[in-house]
């Protein structure tokens, strides 16, 4: 059991001594990583996350997004996440479910970016959506949105 804990603690980027500490002795970001290590302890195929970057500063949130993306790729995880963080959405998600008009719309980010529904347009193309799109396009290759790229939507 100790070896599994040490492996998962290292996997999420925590120092070895973090395993001997109480949550009150860890920073907010370290607590998030500790919770993630606990979630990975049983080697799940599906990882459920609820607002994983809530309470983190932008630098720590971006690092956590990269960690989730790396774990998703290296472990073959399916990640089901509830988030309102557009940066996280654009950094991690392959498919997105949006609740609008008491219905769930599921699609790729490109699908939602092209959706004509006023609320979806306001959410994904508003100031925060444009900032997330622009930040994502500068960090990664452009996501095709029909005949437009992310840079063309800002």
Task: Kindly label every feature range from the protein language model.
Residues 2-17:
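Conserved ABC ATPase "signature" region
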Residues 41-45:
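A short, proline-enriched helix->beta-strand linker immediately N-terminal to the Walker B motif
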Residues 83-84:
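H-loop/switch region of ABC-family ATPase nucleotide-binding domains
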Residues 89-91:
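A short, surface-exposed alpha-helical micro-motif characterized by mixed small hydrophobic
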């Amino acid at each position: 059991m100790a070896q599994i804990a040490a492996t998962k603690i290292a996997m999420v980027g925590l120092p070895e001594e973090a395993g001997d500490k109480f949550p009150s002795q860890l920073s907010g970001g370290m607590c998030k990583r500790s919770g993630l290590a606990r979630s990975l302890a049983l080697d799940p195929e599906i990882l459920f996350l609820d607002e994983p970057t809530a309470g983190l500063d932008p630098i720590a949130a971006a690092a956590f997004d990269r960690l989730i993306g790396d774990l998703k790729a290296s472990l073959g995880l399916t990640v089901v996440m509830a988030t309102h963080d557009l940066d996280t959405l654009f950094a991690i998600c392959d498919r997105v479910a949006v609740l609008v008009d008491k219905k769930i719309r599921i699609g790729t980010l490109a699908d939602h970016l092209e959706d004509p529904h006023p609320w979806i347009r306001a959410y994904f193309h508003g100031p925060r959506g444009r900032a997330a799109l622009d930040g994502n396009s500068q960090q990664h290759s452009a996501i095709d949105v029909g005949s437009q790229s992310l840079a063309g939507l800002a």
